[in-house]
Amino acid sequence: MAVDSFSKYGIDVDLSVFDTAADKNVTHKLLQENDFTAYDLLIGPLTSNAFDFVIKSIPDEVKVVSPLSKTKLENINIIHTIPEDHLLFNKMISYIEKDTIRSEKFIIADSYNKEVSDKIKRIFPNAHQFFSEINDSGIDTRTMVYDSLDSTFVKGRNLVFLETKDQGFVSNISSILNSFVNDTIEIILTTTNKNRAFEGTNISNYYMSNLNFHYPSINRSISTYKDNNFVKKYSSRYNDYPSKYAIRGHDLTLDLLIRLRCGELDSNNLNLVQSEYIENRFRYVKDKDGIYRNNSAYIMKFQNLELIQIE
């Protein structure tokens, strides 16, 4: 459907779709039977293993786009569309540093995330550090109890970093923090790495909303874009709202087609242009090794049970 959007500008796109069937043998056969040097751009495969297999078999002159997954490969023909974790970390930290409202800062982490906790502590030296409980056997329980944080928070604004990849710990901490919120104590929960632990079925949306959960994200929410033409067409065709993956596919493909048409994929000016679509924004920067990476992201906030873009 991104190609349909592009065609309204009077520009034809010759599109070929190849189904790897998530099978290495099928992928190998496709690579053997097709001349991919005839294409301006190759988007995918979607999974990291399949993508890595393809990139090792494709000539360097073919630009290959990693749409949904990250790859550790550093080939100069790869266009990395997923922002790196360190960029998301820096964006969240920068947002907090620019905040002019005074707040006490706290860092809560499990032992597996001590390194990032210490990193945040170096940036905010006055922040108070807390770690999950270690049992008598020396095992991290990835839990804390109410008494561990009792009398910790001050009247006014309290900003709490939660650094973990454990869903149970997120559930545990968000519940405890929520119990401290009252008319005089405000608690804002944030993280520098919103992973799947923050999205599990055990996570209370009410708690996260009540804590005004802030986080960095590669995409924004569709909730305010239901009147978008693409969303309407997709809903009409498939009788459902598009998933974040379908929207990313649309945004990413449309952006690359426009950049390809303008010659930006072969231009040093590529890093000067930021574009934004339904849920995604793109600003590619060529690093010291000549590799293109997307350096655009969002800051989102959970408020009144809705996701709001704040930066």
Predicted regions and their residues:
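Periplasmic-binding protein-like
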Residues: 35-47, 65-67, 104-110, 154-173, ...
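Beta-alpha junction/loop-to-helix N-cap segments that form part of ligand/metal-binding clefts
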Residues: 11-72
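Segments of small-molecule ligand-sensing domains
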Residues: 239-243, 257-307
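Extracellular glycoside hydrolase catalytic/binding regions
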Residues: 63-67, 72-90
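An alpha-beta-alpha
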Residues: 84-135
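Extracellular/periplasmic periplasmic-binding protein-like sensory domains
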Residues: 173-248
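A short, well-structured beta->alpha microelement
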Residues: 12-31, 127-154
